[in-house]
């Protein structure tokens, strides 16, 4: 049986596991059960020498300012140029941002746009992960808004993979769907308010739709409540608990272990995500104390540009988009 020394912050949160006969002056525990000292987390194992093994406690990395940005794009060439500028314009240290880029089974040039962005700006970030492998030939044949259980399962898998990647490195997590456009202050605001473990910036649309449900029905989908419109029109301002946050949100790294997008119910993956959190008594919050961007559904880039120059003209300066976009 091994002897275990439990590291602290000064030792970079590592466990050293020694052979039974090794004499140590430090406090020792005689057990194989590392989870006894740090529950719910996996351990990164490295062999050192002379039978000594090192385990890094990834779960203890709670104090970090590094963030994974999940860019999950399929058939999004119409909005990716504007979206990627919004991501690039975040006023947060890029060396502390890690891009997780996943695209699959496209019928347009989304992959090419993403690769061009990586080629131009990738080295400015802390790291970049890119994967364009196919997940399901069936997905490629489906219409853009053909929502069905198979598609929910694939999208849930994609989202879960990005969560696991952030969890592996102990980073915070931020995702914005590719038709969700966030202003440069967004990630900074999320980090400033990270005491709210799951937090979404309110993103309005031209209609009454937004990236949250104030309450839900028995199946976890939207249900009417007067406070929905009060939040949307900022009659209630600040960070408020809601029953669903979706599309764009921040997750504190110590909450990633509780995230799941698949519960076997074959529902929308965002419904499962929120339902799992509610069952674990983890509150989701919406923050609307500032303008953080907007949400659109355009399938044509020219239509998007027209919409930005017309309906959203008042908001464009907030995004600091380069003049050559139009």
Question: Where are the regions that the model predicts?
Answer:
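Short, acidic, metal-binding catalytic loop of nucleotide-sugar glycosyltransferases
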Residues: 85-96
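Short beta-strand-to-loop acidic/aromatic patch adjacent to the donor-nucleotide binding site
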Residues: 170-181
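Cell-envelope/extracellular polymer assembly enzymes that use nucleotide-activated donors
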Residues: 66-68, 98, 272
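Conserved catalytic core of nucleotide-sugar-dependent glycosyltransferases
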Residues: 163, 183-262
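A conserved acidic beta->alpha catalytic loop
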Residues: 102-119, 132-136, 180
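Active-site-proximal specificity loops/subdomain of glycosyltransferases
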Residues: 117-169
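A structural helix-start
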Residues: 73-81, 103, 107
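C-terminal catalytic/acceptor-binding lobe
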Residues: 2-30, 34, 236-249, 253-326
């Amino acid at each position: 049986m091994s002897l275990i020394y439990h590291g602290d912050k000064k030792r970079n949160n590592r466990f050293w596991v020694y052979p039974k006969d090794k004499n140590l002056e430090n406090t020792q525990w005689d057990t194989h059960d590392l989870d006894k000292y740090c529950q719910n987390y996996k351990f990164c194992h490295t062999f050192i020498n002379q039978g000594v093994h090192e385990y890094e406690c990834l779960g203890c990395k709670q104090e970090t300012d590094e963030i994974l940005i999940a860019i999950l794009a399929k058939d999004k060439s119409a909005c990716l140029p504007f979206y990627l500028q919004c991501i690039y314009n975040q006023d947060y240290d890029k060396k502390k941002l890690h891009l997780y880029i996943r695209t699959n089974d496209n019928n347009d040039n989304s992959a090419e746009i993403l690769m061009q962005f990586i080629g131009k700006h990738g080295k400015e970030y802390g790291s970049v992960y890119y994967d364009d492998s196919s997940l399901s030939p069936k997905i490629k044949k489906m219409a853009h808004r053909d929502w069905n259980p198979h598609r929910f399962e694939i999208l849930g898998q994609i989202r879960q993979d990005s969560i696991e990647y952030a969890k592996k490195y102990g980073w915070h997590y931020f995702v914005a769907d590719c038709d969700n456009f966030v202003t440069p202050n967004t990630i900074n605001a999320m980090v400033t308010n990270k005491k709210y473990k799951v937090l979404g910036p309110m993103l309005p649309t031209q209609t009454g739709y937004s990236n949250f449900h104030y309450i839900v029905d028995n199946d976890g989908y939207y249900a009417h409540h007067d406070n929905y419109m009060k939040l949307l029109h900022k009659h209630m301002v600040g960070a408020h608990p809601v029953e669903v946050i979706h599309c764009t949100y921040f997750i504190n790294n110590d909450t990633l272990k509780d995230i799941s997008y698949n519960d076997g119910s074959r529902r929308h993956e965002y419904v499962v995500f929120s339902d799992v959190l509610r069952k674990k008594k983890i509150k989701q919050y919406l923050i609307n104390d500032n303008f953080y961007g907007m949400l659109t559904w355009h399938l044509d880039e020219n239509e998007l540009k027209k919409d930005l120059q017309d309906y959203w003209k008042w908001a464009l300066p907030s995004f600091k988009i380069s003049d050559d976009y139009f």
